[in-house]
Amino acid sequence: GKHPDKDTVDLASEAALGALRDGGVSMRDMGILAAGCLMQSNAGIGQQLQKQIGQTGIPVYNVANACATGATALRTAIMAVKSGEVEMGLAVGVEKLAGAGLLGAGGRPKSDKNEWKPSGRYGAVTSTDGRIGTDSMPGVFAQVGMEYGHKYGGTSFELFAKIAEKNHAHSTLNPLAAYTKRMTLEEIMNDVMIAYPNTRSMCSANCDGAAAAVVVSGSKLRTLSLEQQRRAIKVKASVLTTDPYEEGCQVLPNVNTLTKNAARIAYERAGIAPSDLDLVELHDCFATAELVHYDNLM
């Protein structure tokens, strides 16, 4: 939500201490701290966080990786534990985004010329933003959803809105959610249109928030209490991918290939198939994104 009375370190501290308390451990047990923060990536959030929750001399990794920043911090802790370098680590992701405005490209400047010349470090043409597409996140995922609908059929404005209806209903079950208000399908469809087919209620808001997790090795876990062992969640796979080069991505980013690749590798490492899943927690930055990624996870 919005926390004008708390800064980034306050939010990170609250999440970190909550995770440590929930796990029944302390900073003295941690062998690594991985801190993810994109908007203040040069601020050394991890070191600032240490000053609030405990400075024990352990290595700190500050990571910034766009929408995957928090997940990358978690993966950093997982890799450190998996390598055998440490037995236990703490991962934290935090952002202060309330009031940050539109994320993505800033739009086409008024001083920009219409002249089209090949340029750029990667051999790309001049920016397409504001000409034949957009790099702003609402625009990108609106295009992604429409492209998916044209390619496969079966989608509609109402179908995308039903995804948001379901998610708003789920929010009422989580006291820590940014918004905990159920919304009707009609309210969602009649809300302010941001980028068709996503209305405001179908877009994730820019919020302040933080999350944290304690990662522990299997051997270390066996030395902890039975209750700690019972509540521990096994990490069967953690995968990070990037986009392979495609010429068309200069106009519209391909959010599908890297997701499909990550899912495929994760299933292989975990030794399961999509049909084995009982629950999926899926990043729903926009309602259109959720539907597209259903398919990408199959």
Where are these regions (language model features)?
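Short coil/turn connectors at secondary-structure junctions
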Residues: 27-30, 56-59, 83-89, 155-159, ...
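Short acidic, glycine/serine/threonine-rich loops at helix termini
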Residues: 3-5, 100-106, 172-175, 226, ...
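Conserved active-site "lid/cap" helical segment
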Residues: 1-68, 144-157, 163, 178-184, ...
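Short glycine/threonine-rich loop-to-helix capping motif typified by GTGT followed
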Residues: 40-50, 247-251, 284-298
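Conserved catalytic cysteine-centered active-site region
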Residues: 37-88, 92, 96, 100-101, ...
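Active-site-proximal alpha-helical scaffold in enzymes
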Residues: 64-95, 138-173, 213-219
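Condensing-enzyme catalytic core mediating Claisen C-C bond formation in acyl metabolism
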Residues: 1-9, 18, 122-131, 151, ...
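Functionally critical mobile loop/hinge segments
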Residues: 132-142, 146-204, 211, 228-230
